[in-house]
């Protein structure tokens, strides 16, 4: 970026601050250290430290915990997303608690009013009459449950709000439909009341919110453990900067005076925490709601949810400032018309696009600058009955391209996540197609590394004469695939030693000859 800028303004480009959001937060911390003396911001926790803290917390969970089966990576991601959304453990607990309480209130009311989904499955009913009538009663009940409810968080409505909105829309569409169909009603039921037990149907998010309540406590303990070690994680860099600017008026005014012209690139990738940092730099009354700020972004790209980003952040930006001007960029310099046409067909399927929520509708029909600059593309869309068919077809296509003389280096397979690429790999290998696969690995999730960590923990437990930990670790370690031991024999050995509660030394001869 700086090199490109220097082509326009020369050496003055080195006087301009060009940062990532984390880099900007770090710049503030380093340049205004006197405002951060009470913060533990000298020791950034690396992946190993974070892994150890989370592993310790997870190991201390009860066996009945809903978090017990989650891997460390998913817990790390969940905490990161919460921080990026500016949601503290306390806030998260309140949100989940409110959802659970409202779900219970709804279930009680449905029971009292004898509103039961099973009536929809009775034989001989007039579905055209019964289905709408049932769901209209459900809508009335939802309205009663939600009456006078204040959201636990100002920007997070209870889940039943969205259930109510979806059902209201469904009933309205049914009234206007030329032909009655039960499919939309069944889809609604599965989407919002998809859990079935002996008492009937439950809101689909019921158990999820119970799990979130547990996670909020886990998240809180993680924060406490991190701070007790005098550490902070990557997301804390922005969060602590936000807190300090909010609390220290002098710092806020200094930053607002220094950074009077702000350009935000790829704004669709901005999360709530990053947006709040920008807001603090631009909310001075002297700006009269019109600071010198320019945001460049494409809300259609926000569907990838990069680092907690949401397209609503762009809409918030529009409403935050006075008389915000929208500059519509309709010329594309990178693609031919065929590509843009296909992209448009996909983008039009996105619900709640930015242009539909702005007071002035903007034209999102993108035009190619010059088709002659690119070769004509070959686009094909395929539907498959199974992933096996899909992966087989991709491998065959790549093999045929290579046989036709196309260099393998000119071929790429793109996917939104790593899992489908990993599943595709055996099909390419079967065709003897060499691949270059790049992935940012979490070494602690590697099976071999995880096994070595467990074995190391066992050695320490033996050294410490910790019988409980040995009893817990030994069966798991003996079950590792590379030992190739009979699972039945491992179970027998585990049962024998646990039942006798023998000494540490008795494990070794027993296990060596199992």
Can you say where each PLM-predicted feature lies in the sequence?
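Conserved motor-region signature of P-loop NTPase helicases/translocases
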Residues: 1-3, 91, 95, 250, ...
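"flanking P-loop NTPase cores in genome-maintenance ATPases
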Residues: 60-210
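Polyanion-engaging groove/track-forming segments
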Residues: 78-84, 88-91, 206, 290, ...
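A general alpha-helix detector
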Residues: 53-60, 78, 218-222, 240, ...
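Conserved P-loop NTPase-based nucleic-acid remodeling module centered on helicase motor cores
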Residues: 2-101, 109-111, 115, 312-316
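Conserved helicase NTPase motor core
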Residues: 1, 17, 45-50, 101, ...
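Accessory C-terminal helicase-associated subdomains
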Residues: 209-213, 466-467, 514
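Gly/lys/ser-thr-rich phosphate-binding loops in alpha/beta enzymes
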Residues: 1-11, 412, 419-428, 498-505, ...
